[in-house]
Amino acid sequence: MNINPYFLFIDVPIQAAISTTFPYTGVPPYSHGTGTGHTIDTVIRTHEYSNKGKQYVSDVTGCTMVDPTNGPLPEDNEPSAYAQLDCVLEALDRMDEEHPGLFQAASQNAMEALMVTTVDKLTQGRQTFDWTVCRNQPAATALNTTITSFRLNDLNGADKGGLVPFCQDIIDSLDKPEMTFFSVKNIKKKLPAKNRKGFLIKRIPMKVKDRITRVEYIKRALSLNTMTKDAERGKLKRRAIATAGIQIRGFVLVVENLAKNICENLEQSGLPVGGNEKKAKLSNAVAKMLSNCPPGGISMTVTGDNTKWNECLNPRIFLAMTERITRDSPIWFRDFCSIAPVLFSNKIARLGKGFMITSKTKRLKAQIPCPDLFSIPLERYNEETRAKLKKLKPFFNEEGTASLSPGMMMGMFNMLSTVLGVAALGIKNIGNKEYLWDGLQSSDDFALFVNAKDEETCMEGINDFYRTCKLLGINMSKKKSYCNETGMFEFTSMFYRDGFVSNFAMEIPSFGVAGVNESADMAIGMTIIKNNMINNGMGPATAQTAIQLFIADYRYTYKCHRGDSKVEGKRMKIIKELWENTKGRDGLLVADGGPNIYNLRNLHIPEIVLKYNLMDPEYKGRLLHPQNPFVGHLSIEGIKEADITPAHGPVKKMDYDAVSGTHSWRTKRNRSILNTDQRNMILEEQCYAKCCNLFEACFNSASYRKPVGQHSMLEAMAHRLRMDARLDYESGRMSKDDFEKAMAHLGEIGYI
């Protein structure tokens, strides 16, 4: 098929070529070594933006705090964090006037949602800083260790099931003179070595009770653990990201839910919608601006970029915002919403692993953990690190953490910060001048539209917007923002020119083989191509090419070339033998050396379904054997989810259809974890899995409801089994003897 590539771009704006300029196919850069340097950079930068604010020392933690709100107004274009509280409140007042009843409705909905939210909501989420072991754990594990430790201190709110009583426990825990908790300690045992002389030292993890004082506990509760952000393209240097602990999570959740309710009803907000819904919102905004443009006037669009969005924002502004938004709510809910910002304005950053230094002779290396950073002479560090440490000194605590009262960490309060950005966009005009502005905001990304009679007035509007933002602690970057006539801009990596330009290059990294298993990988590969045709404007010629490239990649990955190919190899020997003995060769899966019959018409059909009628009966029987022990039939039925990593933005979850067959194998867990102190975690996980299986055996899935009331799982199961036994006995399906035995068993457990 000879196509002159020039034809592809006839009648297409030049922006459509964006896909050709963005071929991110390689492996993205990952960080290695210590993240301490990046975290210290963040701490120093954040304090520099706020350095003219009020400084004081916290009564509770003894940390040095900085409050930049209502600080001096900037005299230059450098980024600064001096938000003026009255300006923030006035911007919110205007938002309230423009959207009457929005704040009350959002608060009411958030409050009602909070009342029925259960504690298990906190198990959603990835890594969470666990205060009992001072490191990151999966969210569910961190919640579990917290609840079990709380019980030791007579805090049993979690047993009631609701999020509110658990949050009440968190508040109470901050007042306890000391906290007891379970931690894991390694006990070293000397054992004689079997196969050689001498001894082996075996580490045995033990669960032990431990105590910490109130101040120590508060410091841990306020700590954010920091890591280096991985796989970030297009940047030379890495940056730090933070993980909050379980104490902060519950409160943040409610505030973010409140802000989400507001964002959903603001036409300028790019959150929480995504994909095609977001594109529709953007197209509407553009159309609205163009229709409002004065006759003979001009409409400009700024593709905006904010300098250090997170580091110039301040929790104290968020406190003022939640207070203003919940103004008409009950006092308990207002208090509840104010906790998250208060905790954040006292937050403490953990600095990570510390630095590695080498001896003068370069022979010896040593890791200096964070608590000891200042206990060795500064001359031992290189110049860059020495300069960092000198600036860090005023905010350093002896436990190896740093006080970080100003600034927000990445990923926290995305919705609420969007509300702040939209508030700036909603002001529209200052001093009744001859221009109007409007725009779109999604976390730290924005697009600004300005309408005016001529270019100079447009520029005046943009400058006024720039100054307005400064009053709210938002710093629009004059170097990185650029201005065009409306109809051409970029917002959240969506490129617009008289409509959205197709941009599937972003998705190119995810076109490869996912690496789950042969069956899932084929389904995922085809689904991604299908989704890109639907959502990202990928054309038929490109899609056809993508299918062929994917199949080639798939065959190379799993070493399963066509049965009639000349490729040699262990697996190919078996495949060729199968090829020889098969009549319906079109029915062989690609993973078994069969041909590819995917094209643009049948992308959405799982391969097994597509080839079902072409298969030889004995091949079909082997492929779809229901008793095959290597296939987890239950876990593969119906829709599954895969994690897809595009070049930009977060990992996306994607649904795909898969039919379980011989190629749907499950891999075993890595066994090296069994010798670490996380072994307890695995044993607990297995225990939970057994409980859940037992529960599912008692209740068929149709009778699941969201739990209300205070029953334990045990009570619910016993109750259900009693009912079932009685019904079976009364209808004659169960003998009297069996019925009495069943009741006796339930009696032994203590429920009758």
UniProtKB/Swiss-Prot annotation:
A motif (Nuclear localization signal) lies at residues 187-195, 203-216. Phosphorylated by host PRKCA. Its EC number is 2.7.7.48. It is found in: Host nucleus; Host cytoplasm. InterPro entries: RNA-dir_pol_NSvirus, RNA_pol_PB1_influenza. Residues 249-256 are annotated as: Promoter-binding site. GO terms for biological process: DNA-templated transcription; symbiont-mediated suppression of host gene expression; symbiont-mediated suppression of host mRNA transcription via inhibition of RNA polymerase II activity; viral RNA genome replication; viral transcription. It catalyses: RNA(n) + a ribonucleoside 5'-triphosphate = RNA(n+1) + diphosphate. Residues 286-482 form the RdRp catalytic domain. GO terms for molecular function: nucleotide binding; RNA binding; RNA-directed RNA polymerase activity. Gene3D superfamilies: 6.10.140.720. One of its GO terms (cellular component) is host cell cytoplasm. Keywords: Eukaryotic host gene expression shutoff by virus, Eukaryotic host transcription shutoff by virus, Host cytoplasm, Host gene expression shutoff by virus, Host nucleus, Host-virus interaction, Inhibition of host RNA polymerase II by virus, Nucleotide-binding, Nucleotidyltransferase, Phosphoprotein, RNA-directed RNA polymerase, Transferase, Viral RNA replication, Viral transcription. RNA-dependent RNA polymerase which is responsible for replication and transcription of virus RNA segments. The transcription of viral mRNAs occurs by a unique mechanism called cap-snatching. 5' methylated caps of cellular mRNAs are cleaved after 10-13 nucleotides by PA. In turn, these short capped RNAs are used as primers by PB1 for transcription of viral mRNAs. During virus replication, PB1 initiates RNA synthesis and copy vRNA into complementary RNA (cRNA) which in turn serves as a template for the production of more vRNAs. Influenza RNA polymerase is composed of three subunits: PB1, PB2 and PA. Interacts (via N-terminus) with PA (via C-terminus). Interacts (via C-terminus) with PB2 (via N-terminus); this interaction is essential for transcription initiation. HAMAP family: INFV_RDRP (MF_04065). Belongs to the influenza viruses polymerase PB1 family. This is RNA-directed RNA polymerase catalytic subunit. It comes from Influenza B virus (strain B/Panama/45/1990).
